[in-house]
Amino acid sequence: MLSPKRTRFRKQHRGRMKGISCRGNHICFGRYALQALEPAWITARQIEAGRRAMTRYARRGGKIWVRIFPDKPVTVRPTETRMGSGKGSPEYWVSVVKPGRIIYEMSGVSEAVAKAAMEIAACKMPIRTQFVISG
């Protein structure tokens, strides 16, 4: 699963997801792409599940690019602990995705295969997405 090799700080604030994505909202590498329509945190597990599903469907043909990276640690407190005594420990990593952000890109396959593969990957995502073609 994806995670940063090292970070400056172990824990981060939760932050806010307002507005639309101003970066990573154009197709750069492939011909087809999956674009987010809603804001959300997408976990490293969800990214990996979508990537695997697309790879399996496309078989040998095609190349896949993952355009998001989980660089935000999410802390979780142990169950049945009292309030106070600091913040919980980092449990998993998420990528902050805003509307318009490209999640996956694909090329080297037909449009029908790419669309079907992207739909399978979209089912693994916690948000609504759309299939985009470059050009």
Curated annotation (Swiss-Prot):
Q: Where in the cell is it found?
A: Plastid, Chloroplast
The record's section on CDD domains has: Ribosomal_L16_L10e (cd01433)
What PANTHER family does the entry give?
50S/60S RIBOSOMAL PROTEIN L16, LARGE RIBOSOMAL SUBUNIT PROTEIN UL16M
Keywords for the protein's UniProt record, in alphabetical order: Chloroplast, Plastid, Ribonucleoprotein, Ribosomal protein
Tell me the Pfam families matching this sequence.
Ribosomal_L16
Q: Which InterPro entries match?
A: Ribosomal_uL16 (IPR047873), Ribosomal_uL16_bact-type (IPR000114), Ribosomal_uL16_CS (IPR020798), Ribosomal_uL16_dom (IPR016180), Ribosomal_uL16_sf (IPR036920)
**Gene for this protein?**
rpl16
Subunit description: Part of the 50S ribosomal subunit.
Q: Which family does it belong to?
A: Belongs to the universal ribosomal protein uL16 family.
GO annotations of cellular component type: chloroplast; mitochondrial large ribosomal subunit
Q: What is this protein called?
A: Large ribosomal subunit protein uL16c
What's a GO biological-process term for it? mitochondrial translation
Main subcellular localisation: plastid
- One GO MF term attached to the UniProt entry: rRNA binding
